[in-house]
Regions:
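Alpha-helical segment proximal to the catalytic Tyr-Lys
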Residues: 128, 167-174
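Residue(s) in the substrate-gating loop at a strand-loop-helix junction
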Residues: 142
């Protein structure tokens, strides 16, 4: 018997990386997991097939509000309820923080649209169902929302907004709980070409390495399973923010 037997979880952006690791961690505790991606359909289906519990895949792009609504509706239609929403999907590209000319409106708008609007739309659509089950939300944010660092100024702005959203939902929508997991640099397919950053973090972080998706998934599970945790921004950075 797992601690999440009979629960239904939806993890956005879960065809790889933190989302995939979180899907596996949730399923290992007995949850039915809906896996999502905007484009990597085969990878998403492969994640579902590897889960130890019954899962389901739904393709949706969270930068489109109607697709967010359809993703929530599809989850509830398939499993009859929603207990856990993990907002992991996001987007970024590297832009030097000192080069404002390089931070084009297209980059700024896409970063905000996917990371902020998409997460908000998911929370908005999910909230009525989560209130029925007294469920919980975990937003995957970043230490870039706590310190002036990360892949770009726009990314830091977006993740700071999500940290604020997390606290607001926790304060005003109980008994639904809402927490955030704020990783440092994570070794995922998304950051596989950022070798210089991984080397830099490994050199200065007390942990001596970048995070793994599994490190982050463990933090997601802490937020999901600790029934008195709400409004917490949980850093998973190996001590990086202690030295930067």
């Amino acid at each position: 018997m797992g601690s999440l037997d009979g629960k239904v979880a939806l993890v956005t952006g879960s065809s790889s990386g933190i989302g995939e690791a979180s899907a596996h961690a949730l399923a290992a505790e007995g949850a039915h997991v809906v896996v999502n991606s905007s484009s990597s359909v085969d990878a998403g289906m492969a994640v579902v097939e590897a889960l130890p519990t019954e899962g389901h895949y739904i393709r949706a792009d969270i930068s489109d509000e109607s697709q967010c609504q359809a993703l929530i509706a599809g989850t509830v239609e398939r499993f009859g309820r929603l207990d856990i929403l993990v907002n992991n999907a996001g987007w970024t590209t590297r832009v030097d923080h000192t080069d404002h000319a390089a931070l084009t409106n297209d980059i700024l708008f896409k970063t905000i649209e996917v990371n902020v609007y998409g997460t908000w739309w998911m929370c908005k659509a999910a909230m009525p169902h989560l209130k029925e089950t007294e469920g919980n939300i975990v937003n995957v944010t970043s230490i870039a929302g706590l310190r002036p660092m990360g892949s770009s100024l726009a990314y830091g702005m977006a993740k700071a907004a999500l940290n604020s959203l997390t606290e607001d939902l926790a304060k005003f929508h109980g008994p639904v709980r809402c927490n955030a997991v704020a990783p440092g640099l994570v070794a995922t397919p998304w950051t596989s070409e950022w070798g210089d950053l991984h080397a830099g973090i490994s050199a200065i972080a007390p942990s001596g390495r970048s995070a793994t998706p599994e490190d982050c998934a463990q933090a997601v599970m802490a937020c999901v399973t600790n029934t008195y945790m709400s409004g917490t921004i949980l850093k998973v950075d190996g001590g990086t923010t202690l030295v930067l």
